[in-house]
From Swiss-Prot:
GO terms for molecular function: alpha-amylase activity; cyclomaltodextrin glucanotransferase activity; metal ion binding; starch binding. Residues 173-236 are annotated as: B. Keywords: Calcium, Disulfide bond, Glycosyltransferase, Metal-binding, Secreted, Signal, Transferase. This is Cyclomaltodextrin glucanotransferase. Binds 2 calcium ions per subunit.
Length: 718
């Protein structure tokens, strides 16, 4: 039986010999992987990718002629608050010399590419610059210290030729530091539109910014409508700002970017962001994920709601916290890691779309002098083989250290390809494209104690099993291990780099073995699928007429049927059909959440649940209600006649709880909502305390939404 299984594996996984450790030359992903779902052209799905987050300024100076001059620049990079010279040409150089390809990286997440302020800012006697990219002034121009538009286009083109996607950081929450009373401070938060001044923070007569002071982060509302530190906070309920950011992101999409990382999503109205995402998906849909900072692995209701309802994924801080606690800080054990995976799978509708990571530019690096290299290598192996889209912070493969800003943003120390961390990444990263169990699979714990975790990823008939022993001094005897691996002998994909061993399976029962101290091993089986099996649908929402990409296995070559709920889509509405990918037009059905299924050769696939169909083009509307007094424990909610307002439900799909502290004060309440454009809405507010509902009286309120821009509708409680 194993000989047959082995033939299937060799015939369906082009990279098998590479994964087993043979010295095949590394080819770009576009050359190795023939499946459509794994191609660099698949901008809607990053499940088969490994992201490499790079601080552009800190990576490599490929063009010294574009470096800043004077006090803003330190070519030695000893002053980490100044520019160090890294640019897009430096990235191009490392793409061309195959550093990223040899590492196994298939997506680069670069610093925000837009023009930042040129002024330096003195904080506590230290000169600060916008090297990080988060002090924008013009979202329609490039940061000249990174390169020109031509340079950026060259970066995208060069990356694509090597099978590498480009993700841009994007920060529509704010412009740059400003002081209300001092127009000479920095650049007064001024916003420009391709060189033309839109407005500054002081004397903001057009209401482009919020002027509510700095946030103390005590509530979600406080963090949204007040300034993030001293950054000039943009008012997304202003039609000019709304249009500006829809136009600005389209400019970068038209340059060919493949993904967007949205900064500070916790600090912008969810309703505006959903309307913005709808405009992106209607233009050129790309994988988008946001930053919602969490300080622990504990569930957060607002974070979960955003991940499930906003139209974008999130950086998975719950995953990050659990991994750091277990592997870096020794403050919890493998049971906590397993619990995190179980809890997040239950909480996040599309858990495989959340972006996993072990460190980034806003926290201490994983590696310190007190953290053994093996713990870093194990954390990398876990992240690369776990659910979600893995992101590796630049320099991790070189064991770069640094606690806090700016030390966690140091200069790339070397480009060695011989470190163990580099080796671990390069061996495991290709699994995401060769074995769909890693890209799309479910997760099941198979063996566990405080220090050892053995888990299985499974998709269809494809399987991967990963064993990690974080105890660096004590081996563990593994008995009674049962998996879905077919009968046969399986070699460690890592080739023993982390002291892993081979195993033998007999009908899924694994012969007893000893997992060495500090060992990590990965065993995998890849099989072809004859049954249609959906792994991913992207984007996660869209309006009728948008094209959606369905990825998976076993769809066959003959065009079948796609179902949105019970609505069948056939014929020309299916724009392409391949064994691993289908592109289909969303049918003209009512807005709401739908299960997507595929029928091929008379066989129905699994259901991919919670795909959101919008009622049409979206606009952001602020709903305000006056004189809504409440008793202790009561909050104000909104519902109405479209799915975006909950279709008259008082349950989880209703809107709220409304806010009443910053833009308006109690007993006036407000909330920003993404609703269909150019449509007459009917709606009502209600009070809710647990299961107790109190509706306002009178007839339904009505409001016709604008066809573009934003609006505010204000009513009195009746």
């Amino acid at each position: 039986m194993f000989q047959m299984a082995k033939r299937v594996l060799l015939s369906t996984t082009l990279t098998f010999s590479l994964l087993a450790g043979s010295a095949l030359p590394f080819l770009p992903a576009s050359a190795i992987y023939a499946d459509a779902d794994t191609a660099v052209t698949n901008k809607q799905n990053f499940s088969t990718d490994v992201i490499y987050q790079v601080f552009t300024d800190r990576f490599l100076d490929g063009n010294p002629s574009n470096n800043p001059t004077g006090a803003a620049f330190d070519g030695t990079c000893s002053n980490l608050k100044l520019y160090c010279g890294g640019d897009w040409q430096g990235l191009v150089n490392k793409i061309n010399d195959n550093y990223f390809s040899d590492l196994g990286v298939t997506a680069l997440w670069i610093s925000q590419p837009v023009e930042n302020i040129f002024a330096t800012i003195n904080y506590s006697g230290v000169t600060n610059t916008a090297y990080h990219g988060y002090w924008a002034r013009d979202f329609k121009k490039t940061n000249p210290y990174f390169g020109t538009m031509t340079d950026f286009q060259n970066l995208v083109t060069t990356a694509h030729a090597k099978g590498i996607k480009i993700i841009i950081d994007f920060a529509p929450n704010h412009t740059s530091p400003a002081m209300e009373t001092d127009t000479s401070f920095a650049e007064n938060g001024k916003l420009y539109d391709n060189g033309n001044l839109v407005g500054g923070y002081t004397n903001d007569t057009n209401g482009y910014f919020h002027h509510n002071g700095g946030s103390d982060f005590s509530t979600l509302e406080n963090g949204i409508y007040k300034n993030l530190y001293d950054l000039a906070d943009l008012n997304h309920n202003n039609s000019t700002i709304d249009t500006y950011f829809k136009d600005a992101i389209k400019l970068w999409l038209d340059m060919g970017v493949d993904g967007i990382r949205v900064d500070a999503v916790k600090h912008m109205p969810q309703g505006w962001q959903k309307n913005w995402m709808s405009s992106i998906y209607a233009h050129k849909p790309v994988f988008t994920f946001g930053e919602w900072f969490l300080g622990s692995a504990a569930p957060d209701a607002d974070n979960t709601d955003f991940a499930n309802e906003s139209g974008m994924s999130l950086l998975d801080f719950r995953f990050n916290s659990a991994v750091r606690n277990v592997f870096r800080d020794n403050t919890s054990n493998m049971y906590a890691l397993d619990s995190m995976l179980t809890a997040t799978a239950a909480d996040y509708n599309q858990v495989n779309d959340q972006v996993t990571f072990i460190d980034n530019h806003d926290m201490d690096r994983f590696k310190t002098s007190a953290v053994n290299n093996r713990r870093l290598e194990q954390a990398l192996a876990f992240t690369l083989t776990s659910r979600g889209v893995p992101a590796i912070y630049y320099g991790t493969e070189q064991y770069l250290t640094g606690n806090g800003d700016p030390d966690n943003r140091g200069k790339m120390p070397s480009f060695s390809k011989s470190t163990t961390a580099f080796n671990v990444i390069s061996k495991l990263a290709p699994l995401r494209k060769s074995n769909p169990a890693i890209a799309y699979g479910s997760t099941q714990q198979r063996w566990i104690n405080n220090d050892v975790y053995i888990y299985e990823r499974k998709f269809g008939k494809s399987v991967a099993v990963v064993a990690v022993n974080r105890n660096l001094t004590t081996p563990t005897s593994i008995t009674n291990l049962n998996t879905s691996l077919p009968s046969g002998t399986y070699t460690d994909v890592l080739g023993g780099v982390l002291n892993g061993n081979n195993i033998t399976s007999s009908g899924g029962n694994i012969s007893s073995f000893t997992l060495a101290a500090g060992a990590t091993a990965v065993w995998q089986y890849t099989a072809s699928e004859t049954t249609p099996t959906i792994g991913h649908v992207g984007p996660v929402m869209g309006k009728p007429g948008n094209v959606v990409t369905i990825d998976g296995r076993g769809f066959g070559s003959a065009k079948g049927t796609v179902y949105f709920g019970t609505t069948a889509v056939t014929g020309s509405a299916i724009t392409s059909w391949e064994d691993t990918q289908i592109k289909v037009t969303i049918p003209p059905v009512a807005g709401g959440d739908y299960a997507v299924k595929v029928a091929a050769n008379g066989v129905n696939s699994n259901a991919y649940n919670d795909f959101t169909i919008l009622s049409g083009d979206q606009v952001s509307v602020r709903f305000v209600i006056n004189n809504a007094t409440t008793a202790l424990g009561e909050n104000i909610y909104l519902t109405g006649n479209v799915s975006e307002l909950g279709n008259w439900t008082t349950g989880a799909a209703s809107i709220g709880p409304a806010f009443n502290q910053v833009i308006h004060a109690y007993p006036t309440w407000y909330y920003d909502v993404s609703v269909p454009a150019g449509k007459q809405l009917e709606f009502k507010f209600f009070k809710k305390n647990g299961a107790t509902i109190t509706w306002e009286g009178g007839s339904n309120h009505t409001f016709t939404t604008p066809t573009s821009g934003t609006a505010t509708v204000t009513i009195n409680w009746q």
